[in-house]
Amino acid sequence: MRLWQQMGVAAALSLAVLGPVQAQTAGGSAAAASAAQALPASKPYVIAQTYTLQSQVLNEQRELNIMLPEGYHEHPELRYPVVYLLDGGQHEDFTHMAGAVQYASFSWVQRLPPVILVGIANTDRKRDMTFKASPKFVWPKWMHAYTDAYKNAGGSDAFIRYIETEVQPYVQQHFRTGPDKMLVGQSLAALLATEILLKKPALFNQYVMMSPSLWWDNQSLLKQAPQLLRNMPGAPMKVYLAVGNEGPEMVNDARALAALIRKHKPRNTQFVFEYLPKEDHGTILHPATLNAFAHFFPRPPEK
């Protein structure tokens, strides 16, 4: 008996021994394998490129995920605003926010001009997005279960230097960037964005901050805000702050920051605060970001 005949007989015997249900399963697996083999040729669907930097400031390798606007390579004469996204790793906020940026940039939506999206991926989020806390720092009761996760906290100063001296120069050197630079962050990332706004405001001229974790270090950044705001330069700037229905601590802190910004901001700073009661800490990112885009880039009037 030829080999293929032997194999055929063996397969038939196997199906008979397995019984009806197992035989169907085996047959289904064979059919699935056959269908898989019959799939037409495909190619990867690529929305961005990942670039690895050896950071001298942080002494570690870091990743940037960068999505270019449609038509970037076809129009070498154009330069583009840059949106820097904190929590910008592939398994963080980059992928879904890339979709939001693409959607907002559509010509029939017009909430955002074509931009370069730069996702700043994390290695130790709680280290990089928190400043050094005072020895008198008292953890909020609702954070007691998470304190061990903050054992490396207090590294925001170095992380801000990384953004200023390595990330921004890298992007400006390798891509056709325009003058506008937006920083987007939520939760701890919004705490960092608030710190940059107050202490290094010239790094960006547009800030989107959602649900900032101002509880950190007994609200010390909130307490420093009046003086820091008074010392800010008068260069034109756009600032958007939002909070959802996230409990009294988060809401009250965000409202307090909004009141301080309104009172002490430089004249050329355009500021918008929104309370979004239908959103919570997990859902606020997309609606608030799209609202910020709409405030920063009003749709031109229809002709």
Spans of features found by a protein language model:
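Non-catalytic cap/lid and distal C-terminal segments of serine-dependent acyl enzymes
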Residues: Q24-K303
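Bacterial N-terminal signal peptides
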Residues: G8-L18
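Bacterial N-terminal signal peptides that target proteins for export
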Residues: M1-V9
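Sec/Tat signal peptide C-region and signal peptidase I cleavage site
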Residues: G19-A23
